[in-house]
Amino acid sequence: MANKGPSYGMSREVQSKIEKKYDEELEERLVEWIVVQCGPDVGRPDRGRLGFQVWLKNGVILSKLVNSLYPEGSKPVKVPENPPSMVFKQMEQVAQFLKAAEDYGVIKTDMFQTVDLYEGKDMAAVQRTLMALGSLAVTKNDGNYRGDPNWFMKKAQEHKRDFTDSQLQEGKHVIGLQMGSNRGASQAGMTGYGRPRQIIS
C-alpha cells in the first residue's frame, strides 16, 4: 500500500466497512492453528491486521500450511528455501497457495485475491479463506490436520442413498401430504354453498 494514496469519499467508506469485518479474535485462532500445523519455525506475527498481513505477505507460510495438509511426497506447492523478496515472486507464491487451496476443495467464493493480502485491501477475505481451508481439513479427517478440531466448523457431508427399483415403485403409490389429504375424498363437515352458518347457542 506504499504506492497507493489515501482514499476519499465513497472509496473511503467502502474501505472502512471492509476493515471493520476483520476479526482480531479469529486472527489469534488462525495464528495458533498455523503454528501448530506448520511447526514453531514459522514464528508468530505482531498482533493486529498489519502484523498478520506482513507475516503472510510473501506466501511462504501459506504454502507451508497447504503443504502440511497433504501426505508426505505429494506436496502441491514448491516452497523456496529463502523467502522471495521481489514483489512478483511473492505474489506468485501467494497465487500458488490459492491454486493449491482450490485443488484441496476451497470454493472460489471463499478465496481471497492476491492483492487483498499483498496490499492489505481485504484481510477479512484472507481470514475467510483460511477458515474454509481449516474447515475442509477437519471435515476430511485424513490424519493430516493438526490442532484442536473445535477451532473450525465441520462441513456437512453428503449422505448418498441408493434405493432399489421395488422401493422406487412403492413410492409411486403413496399419496404425499403435499397433495392434500391422504384420507380419501369426503365432504364430511362441509356445508352447502350459499347456506348461512348455523350458530346454535
Curated annotation (Swiss-Prot):
Q: What is its main location?
A: cytoplasm
Residues recorded with modification N6-acetyllysine: K172
* Inducing factors: By growth factors.
InterPro entries per record: Calponin-like (IPR050606), Calponin_repeat (IPR000557), CH_dom (IPR001715), CH_dom_sf (IPR036872), SM22_calponin (IPR003096)
Query: Where is the PTM Omega-N-methylarginine found along the chain?
Result: R183
Any idea where the Calponin-homology (CH) domain is? 24-137
| Swiss-Prot/TrEMBL GO biological process terms | epithelial cell differentiation
Keywords (alphabetical) are: Acetylation, Cytoplasm, Methylation, Muscle protein, Phosphoprotein
Q: Name one GO cellular component term.
A: cytoplasm
Q: N-acetylalanine: which positions carry it?
A: A2
Matching PANTHER family: CALPONIN, TRANSGELIN
The family assignment reads: Belongs to the calponin family.
The protein in question is named Transgelin
Q: Which organism is it from?
A: Mus musculus (Mouse)
